[in-house]
Amino acid sequence: MALSYYKETLRETALKLATPGKGILAVDESTNTCGKRLASIGVENTEENRQAYRGMLFTTEGLGNYISGAILFEETLFQDHADGESMISKLEKEGIIPGIKVDKGLKPLVGALEHETYCSGLDGLTERASDYYARGARFAKWRAVLQITADGPSDLAIRENAWGLARYARSVQEAGLVPIIEPEILMDGDHDILTTSEIQEKIIKEVYFACQQNGVYLEGTLLKPSMTVPGADYEGKSDPKNVALATVTTLLRSVPAAVPGIVFLSGGLSEEEASLYLNEMNLLSADKPWNLSFSYGRACLLYTSDAADEGFC
């Protein structure tokens, strides 16, 4: 099997992505989402302008001192910089590992609750992953979404999304890509932090059970979970120390020690909240078997306000 051939490389790549003090930059926004960011500074959403935006970002001086990997949209993976050099090459010169978003988006999950979804894109995934590997990608990302409600998430939604994440992980490992496993829990709702912790533990355990059934090589994976926070409409205020303790406790109960790194998504959190919570997690004295870091995309917005002054327009 191809997985046997790539095992050592997968482990090494996962460890590099989980380098302490560095995080993963999520720049896998779709063409439409990128267009909204460009529109905020009065720039038309064209391929040339998207190329310039990403090129500016990837050539930021010192980016590789803080970023270990970058998750790209397919257009970016096959795109060249304005100077003719590939975007992949620009990242590699900074010591940043290129990655690729491989899922095809969320679809309604028939038989589940009305709002519940599954993530599409498994058909032909290994073949696509092989093409991405040939272009220079070395890791992948797949996002499943679940929501806490009065009667959810349903067992069907948990099982289906866990199975999809595991099938994706094994499929891309067959092509040499490290899978980032992302079971996002939306912040919608008025539930407390204990409810989030209990449901998140259940979801993550189901994900790793499915990974075991599919023969996923855990040492060659990363987890990208939500932080363990109360619902956005919960009346109480989230204390960073409480969030940190709840998150680490939940993960210690559900994530195997074989996984080298956990990189958090920011979800509905502000930049300040996401940073404070992560900092508190790393200050905890608990023995954590994995490196804890970030995989945020919102920081990209910090570059846009000065884009015109930098000759972007």
PLM region spans:
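N-terminal capping/small domains of soluble enzymes
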Residues: A2-K90, I97-G105
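Conserved small/polar residues in nucleotide/adenosyl-binding loops
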Residues: Y303-F312
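Short, well-ordered coil/turn segments that N-cap beta-strands
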Residues: T19-G23, L63-S68, E94-P98, G136-R138, ...
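Conserved, mostly hydrophobic/aromatic
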Residues: T46, W142, I181, L223, ...
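N-terminal small/glycine-rich loop or linker at the start of catalytic domains
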Residues: G21-I41, E94-E116, F139-G152, L186-M187, ...
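Alpha/beta enzyme core
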Residues: G124-R135, Y168, E174-L177, E198-L222, ...
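Glycine-rich anion/phosphate-binding loops
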Residues: H115-E127, D155-R167
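Catalytic alpha/beta core domains of metabolic enzymes, predominantly
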Residues: Y217-S295
